[in-house]
Regions:
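Residue-level hotspots at or immediately adjacent to binding/recognition sites across diverse folds
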Residues: 1-329
């Protein structure tokens, strides 16, 4: 019995020594610190992109939430972040070439690059542009940049974005998109079914074009406009709204689609026209907009997509993430 008790006491003592030793090591032993850098992903799950553009054979840009700008020089195979210098939402982007591009966003923000995005500089719209949410920017066939947005904002730049001039009076309308017809007219589409056009070569005493309102059979917000040729154009909007003209915009017919999903953007490569929108919606027409295939960007894609750029058979679709696909798919 005494022998067994001795061994029990020895085990307890040994356990106590081990605990004390571990405690002493924890308090006194200093191991060299090693810092492991954590590199954030270029494209993260919480990213939201609002606009994209394809330039030339390999260059692509996308812009979005919190001032994020990404550029690819490998046809979308890899992306590099660029420093916008801002944290505001960037709503639209257009490019003259692989070096010169313009971005618009919230609070009248305009960013300009002439060096492939290595640097982005802020451009002032003037006092009347302060606080105005700019929603879209596009470049017409003459190289003039047009930016549109809330409170009737319509601005134009004739010097690759260095300076801007207001081209319409302030009004309580948000213009969501701007498009160009082959005869040189500029078309605007906006909330509550508003549509207007003007010839920018004919201006009043204030230097503004004389905008003419167009009545269409839609009262939902219109989000996109595109001309396919001199006679044919399309307008798309919320709740599956899709309008088509075959007489250069004199009259517009409603095209009934088997969907009530929102259509946020339209793009065409000359023979294929594609629209994207809410809950993964993707509509495709090979017939100049007379008939449409209605589906999804991908089978399990229920994300929203706000913009699409097309060049040849390649498509860049942006929204809750990036989707790149071949137009033949």
């Amino acid at each position: 019995m005494k022998k067994e008790k001795f061994f029990q006491l020895a085990e307890v003592a040994l356990s106590l020594l081990i605990v004390v030793g571990i405690y002493w090591l924890g308090e006194n032993l200093k191991l060299p610190e090693k810092t492991i850098p954590v590199t954030p992903s270029i494209i993260e799950g919480r990213d939201e992109f609002y606009a994209g553009v394809i330039v030339g054979e390999k260059v692509r840009w996308v812009v979005g939430k919190k001032g994020k700008i990404l550029r690819s020089e490998s046809n979308g195979a890899g992306w590099n972040p660029q420093n916008s210098g801002v944290k505001k939402a960037l709503q639209g982007i257009a490019a003259w070439d692989e070096k010169k591009a313009v971005v618009v966003g919230n609070d009248g923000l305009v960013l300009l690059t002439h060096d492939s995005g290595n640097t982005w500089e802020k451009v002032q719209l003037g006092n009347e542009g302060l606080g105005v949410k700019l929603l879209k920017v596009r470049i017409d066939p003459e190289g003039v940049a047009w930016a549109v947005g809330a409170m009737g904002a319509v601005y134009a730049s004739h010097d690759t974005g260095k300076s801007w001039r207001r081209m319409a009076r302030t009004q309580d309308i948000a213009w969501n998109d701007v498009g160009f017809s082959p005869d040189g007219k500029v078309w605007l589409v906006g909330e509550f079914g508003h549509v207007a056009f003007a010839d920018p070569k004919h201006v009043d005493d204030n230097g503004e074009p004389e905008w003419q309102a167009v009545k269409v059979s839609a009262d939902r917000s219109l989000m996109a406009v595109i001309f396919l040729d001199a006679q044919t154009a399309l307008i798309a909007g919320l709740d599956g709204t899709l309008l088509r003209t075959k007489d250069s915009g004199k009259s517009w017919e409603k095209i009934l689609l088997p969907t009530r999903e929102h259509i946020f953007a339209l793009a065409s490569n000359g023979h294929t026209t594609v629209g994207v929108g809410s809950r993964g919606l993707r509509i495709v027409s090979q017939q100049g907009g007379s008939s449409w295939e209605v589906g999804r960007v991908a089978k399990e894609d229920f994300n929203w997509h706000t913009d699409i750029a097309i060049k040849g058979e390649e498509q860049l679709i942006v929204g809750a993430g990036l989707v790149q696909m071949n137009g033949r798919e």
